[in-house]
Amino acid sequence: MVKVGMPKVGIIMGSDSDLPVMKEAAKVLEDFEVDYEMKVISAHRTPERLHEYARTAEERGIEVIIAGAGGAAHLPGVLAALTMIPVIGVPIKSKALNGLDSLLSIVQMPPGIPVATVGIDGAKNAALLALEILSIKYPEIKEKLKKYREDMKRKVEEKSKKLEELGWRKYLEG
């Protein structure tokens, strides 16, 4: 996204192989017209860069960080340790344990260093959670979130009505 103003959300991933998952967070933020920055920063391979990112995030206007990582998945926890900005961890599905290793690495933080954690490959929900955090300060985001939820409700009600009218067999056929 072209940065119009200062970014509000940082989307960080440990590897470019995480991009197919993490792009879903970017899509949501774009739909809500919220500025973001997206970077690949490895907690293990580029620790100095990660420290610099965390140290300067607030002065760059970052208010929430979404951090996706697979495997050992230390990125979200290290970021949370280095900054007071809320960090939302996205466990990325791995080959070895289908993302369970990532989930447990992110969710099991020591007391005093919390990381909000979404489901495996849950970048879309991470972005929605980031928007909810921002909506405390930005009423225009809160209004867009209300509309988003109303639209979801309407779609479910439409599907239910269609199912009731057609029956399950015809519903599944078309």
Curated annotation (Swiss-Prot):
One of its GO terms (molecular function) is 5-(carboxyamino)imidazole ribonucleotide mutase activity. It catalyses: 5-carboxyamino-1-(5-phospho-D-ribosyl)imidazole + H(+) = 5-amino-1-(5-phospho-D-ribosyl)imidazole-4-carboxylate. One of its GO terms (biological process) is 'de novo' IMP biosynthetic process. Keywords: Isomerase, Purine biosynthesis. Substrate binds at S15, D18, R45. The keyword Transferase does not apply. Pfam families: AIRC (PF00731). Its EC number is 5.4.99.18. It comes from the Archaea. Pathway: Purine metabolism; IMP biosynthesis via de novo pathway; 5-amino-1-(5-phospho-D-ribosyl)imidazole-4-carboxylate from 5-amino-1-(5-phospho-D-ribosyl)imidazole (N5-CAIR route): step 2/2. SUPFAM superfamilies: N5-CAIR mutase (phosphoribosylaminoimidazole carboxylase, PurE) (SSF52255). Gene3D superfamilies: 3.40.50.1970. Belongs to the AIR carboxylase family. Class I subfamily. Catalyzes the conversion of N5-carboxyaminoimidazole ribonucleotide (N5-CAIR) to 4-carboxy-5-aminoimidazole ribonucleotide (CAIR). This is N5-carboxyaminoimidazole ribonucleotide mutase. It comes from Pyrococcus abyssi (strain GE5 / Orsay). The lineage of its organism: Archaea, Methanobacteriati, Methanobacteriota, Thermococci, Thermococcales.
